């Protein structure tokens, strides 16, 4: 038996990559901090009903489940931190006004997904609770874009949709849940013929609108076509107006904005605008987010909510290979001047590795390209 083998889609993060991930994590949490977002660390394990209540069937399938040996109750290992943040806002903080929370912790999923194709993403995100207006959506979206730009990503494309459009069509036609699910699946695959077949028994206006959703994608000019192609329902009109406002409010961040009205990611979870960020060199979304006003109700306190999250391990997969900073090799010993020089260099942020007695100091293995040497009574740095 090879005891060093790890489970499928579970892997170690080695020093160079780990150092870069940790550096980016700190930068992003500092960014969130100056925007007023407070850092929280939810538990890795919770009672199952707390983790998946109000989040839809997909999260249930993604959650590893164990039996608590203390109580006999079923517990789950978190697969998404967003519901935990909603629980903290609803019960632990219990604020009446707006609250802003952020997090950066590992989650565990039963199947691999995301850019890194891992079952153990490092989920980092920000959530805003207590405000239902488009202004909070814009705040979250701008924060997401800034976070990606801090990581050195450019040429970002942000794709938007709004689940209220599809939801309004479903409600106005009184479509039953089974057909609703089939239409949802057909729209996600942009299968126009399947949508037409499924909607064949519906009112002609609704049928044409559902079919039109598969083609309603593009830049902001597409929204004008959507206004003509979709029924004049109040919820649809508001959704399109909100999407139009988004394009105007992100124009200063040097990103491309697009719209795809058939994209319904998290339809059973989100309640309004949804969005995803893309960049060249990545096979999937860098970050995803949206509005989820109903989730807090599962914890006894419904609160408007919007947020975004990303997998930090996934985002770094397409960055240039990580390189550890070179170190300085210092000789063994307790000479006061030597120790003082070592500490002074470390205060400057330089990596200094002091050799240990009776142990060979391999400069290459230690990633050292220079050493401390004593010259004329002074400790100096010399390159190897």
Name every feature range the model reports, one short phrase each.
Residues 1-83, 138, 159:
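TRNA-binding/sensing appendages of the translation machinery
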Residues 132, 136-137, 159, 166, ...:
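Cap/lid and interdomain-hinge subdomains that line or gate substrate/regulatory clefts
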Residues 65-77, 183-188, 288-290, 375-384:
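Short, basic, helix/turn surface patches
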Residues 62-69, 175-197:
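Acidic, His- and aromatic-enriched active-site or binding-groove loops in soluble protein domains
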Residues 155-166, 183, 258-264:
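Short, surface-exposed recognition loops or helix-turn segments adjacent to catalytic cores
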Residues 162, 190-191, 219:
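Short, solvent-exposed helix-helix connector turns and helix-capping sites enriched
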Residues 44-60, 161-171, 264-272:
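Beta-rich nucleic-acid/ligand-interaction surfaces
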Residues 17-35, 47, 82-95, 101-153, ...:
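Positively charged, Gly/Ser-enriched RNA/tRNA-binding surfaces
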């Amino acid at each position: 038996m090879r005891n060093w083998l790890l489970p499928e889609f579970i892997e170690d993060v080695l020093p160079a990559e780990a150092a870069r991930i940790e550096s980016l994590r700190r930068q992003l949490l500092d960014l969130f901090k100056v925007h007023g977002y407070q850092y929280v660390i939810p538990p890795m394990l919770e009672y199952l009903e707390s983790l998946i209540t109000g989040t839809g069937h997909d999260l249930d399938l993604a959650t590893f489940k164990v039996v608590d040996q203390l109580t006999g109750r079923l517990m789950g290992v978190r697969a998404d931190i967003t519901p935990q943040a909603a629980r903290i806002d609803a019960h632990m903080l219990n604020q009446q006004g707006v609250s802003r929370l952020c997090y950066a912790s590992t989650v565990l999923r039963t199947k691999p997904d995301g850019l890194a194709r891992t079952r153990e993403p490092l989920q980092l995100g920000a959530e805003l609770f207590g405000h239902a207006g488009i202004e909070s959506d814009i705040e979250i979206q701008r924060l997401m874009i800034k976070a990606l730009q801090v990581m050195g990503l450019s040429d970002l494309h942000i794709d938007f949709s709004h689940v209220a459009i599809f939801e309004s069509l479903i409600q106005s036609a009184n479509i039953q849940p089974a057909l609703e699910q089939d239409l949802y699946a057909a729209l996600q695959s942009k299968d126009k013929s399947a949508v037409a077949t499924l909607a064949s028994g519906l009112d002609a206006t609704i049928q044409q609108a559902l079919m039109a959703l598969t083609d309603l994608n593009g830049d902001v000019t597409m929204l004008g076509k959507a206004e003509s192609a979709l029924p004049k329902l109040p919820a649809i009109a508001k959704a399109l107006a909100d999407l139009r406002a988004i394009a105007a409010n992100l124009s200063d961040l040097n990103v491309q904005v697009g719209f795809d009205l058939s994209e319904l990611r998290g339809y059973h979870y989100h309640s309004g605008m949804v969005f995803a960020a893309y960049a060249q060199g990545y096979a999937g979304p860098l970050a995803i987010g949206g509005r989820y006003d109903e989730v807090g109700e599962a914890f006894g306190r419904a609160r408007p909510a919007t947020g975004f999250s990303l997998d930090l391990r996934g985002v770094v997969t397409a960055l240039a290979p990580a390189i550890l900073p070179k170190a300085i090799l210092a000789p063994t010993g307790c000479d006061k001047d030597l120790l003082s020089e070592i500490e002074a260099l470390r205060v400057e942020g330089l990596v200094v590795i002091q050799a240990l007695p009776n142990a060979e100091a391999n400069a290459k293995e230690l990633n050292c390209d220079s050493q401390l040497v004593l010259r004329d009574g002074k400790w100096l740095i010399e390159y190897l």
